[in-house]
Structures are given as C-alpha cells and as structure tokens.
Regions:
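Conserved ABC transporter NBD signature motif
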Residues: 56-67, 71-72
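Conserved ABC ATPase "signature" region
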Residues: 96, 100, 107-125
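ABC ATPase "signature
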Residues: 212-213
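A short, proline-enriched helix->beta-strand linker immediately N-terminal to the Walker B motif
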Residues: 148-152
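Catalytic Walker B motif of ABC-type/P-loop ATPase nucleotide-binding domains
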Residues: 154-158
Length: 247
C-alpha cells in the first residue's frame, strides 16, 4: 500500500525528515508515534500528496508521489489535525459537498453519504449545523468525509486531540472498526492512543525512524511502550501538551 524509500524533507536549511524508509502493507492499523516536532505532520502531508519530498521515493497504492499525486489521492482518505469543516453547513450538506469534491457520481452521492453517516454514527445529527456539534461529533464528521469515495487507505492526524475521555473512547472504537476494511495510518504523540488501536508502530525521533514493529516486538523483555519511547526519543512524551508540531 505504501512504500517510502530514503525520504527526506527540509524547510530551507532545517531538516524535518531525514533518510526515512518504511513499508506499510494492506489491512492493518499503523501508528506513527513521536513527540511534537518529530516530523509526523510532514510525513502525513507527503503521503497525502500535499507536500513534495526534498529527496527519496514515495509510492501510495503503486502511484509515485508527487508525479502521480492525483491518482494517489483518489486512494486516500485524509483527516488532518484540524478537520476542514464549514460551520454554517448542516452535516448532510457538508458531506454531500465533500462527496462531490471527491468525484462521487451524482446518482450515488446521497446513498454513499447515508451509508457513511451510519457507519460513523452521524445518523441523528445530519440536519444539524456543524457549528452546533460537540468536538467529538465534529471529529466524526471529519472522519466521514475521509471515508467518502471508498479509499483504500485512511490517514488520521492526531484524531483524538482535545476530546474528552468519553469522546476519545468512541473515536478509538470507530478507528478499530475502520481497520477491518481499510489500511489505516494514525499519527499521534499519545502513547495510550497507539496502544489502544494500532497493530504496528513506527516511532520517530527528530525526523528519523527510531524503531518499528508490533507492540509485542517493541515491548519485548517486559518493557512498557513508555519506557521504549522515552529511551528512543530522549524522554519527551509530551502526552498532555496538545502542542502543534513545529514543522
């Protein structure tokens, strides 16, 4: 599904990602874990075709980025950390608009929106203005727009930041359900998030890949994920900051 080979990205003279290589096969939930500023958002933007790498090769569903960005984007549903919502629209209006932007055929839009709304638990709020929704429901709307067009790959950037505990539980449950039908990449700096939903983990530190593997592999020898993370990243978990990445 995703092949990344010797990927680097710099902003001027400042490197954000350095010589990164990894492969994501189909059908699992992958966690991209790292402290704020580790390069996660830069990688998300490259994988979704919104940012060109400085060096290296990236393929999504067999399409090379950025040369075949249009074809690759058709295979990807993306939820950025700040969902692109329009508060003056109703949920239904917004999802129909998003379906149109994604090229869903007019004859299929209402049915696809209906099914996606049901899948993401939005049935009862479809007539409501987005501005009237709780943050948890707004996040569901963001996930719903990512699912429109039936993409093979779902990319979620910090999907539970700012949610209350009950909302976090519900969104994590939804992500696990998505993993049954899609390949999912979840970017987070929250250790418990990755432990709760991910089957494979890539740990980043200062723009480099520090470790990768299953949770069982990373925590072999009775070590906790927190201990492994602190050792690899210099002890900066930043779990409670909600701070944006300085990329």
């Amino acid at each position: 599904m995703i092949e990344v080979s010797h990927l680097s990205k710099s902003y001027g003279s400042r490197p954000a990602v350095q010589d990164l290589s990894f492969t994501v096969p189909d059908g699992q939930i992958y966690g991209l874990l790292g402290p704020n500023g580790a390069g996660k958002s830069t990688i998300m933007n490259i994988l979704t075709g919104y940012l060109a790498p400085t060096e290296g090769e990236v393929k999504v569903a067999g399409f090379r980025l950025p040369e075949q960005a249009q074809q690759a984007k058709a295979c990807v549903g993306y939820l950025p950390e700040q969902p692109p919502l329009y508060p003056e629209m109703t949920v239904e209006e917004y999802l129909l608009f998003a379906a149109e932007l994604k090229g869903v055929k007019r004859a299929d839009r209402k049915e696809q929106v209906r099914k996606t709304a049901h899948r993401t638990g939005l049935d009862n709020v479809m007539p409501r203005l987005i501005r009237s929704l709780s943050k948890g429901y707004r996040q569901r709307v963001g996930i719903a727009q990512a699912l429109l067009g039936s993409p093979e790959l779902i990319i979620l950037d910090e999907p539970t930041v700012g949610l209350d505990p009950a909302q976090v539980v519900e969104i994590r449950k939804l992500i696990r359900e998505l993993g049954k039908a899609h390949t999912v990449i979840l970017s987070s700096h929250i250790l418990s998030e990755v432990q709760a939903v991910c089957q494979q983990v890539l740990i980043l530190s200062k723009g480099k890949l520090a470790a990768s593997g299953t949770l069982e592999e990373l925590t072999a020898g009775d070590r906790s994920l927190e201990e492994v993370f602190m050792e690899l990243t210099g002890g900066n978990t930043e779990e409670e900051t909600g701070e944006e990445e300085a990329e």
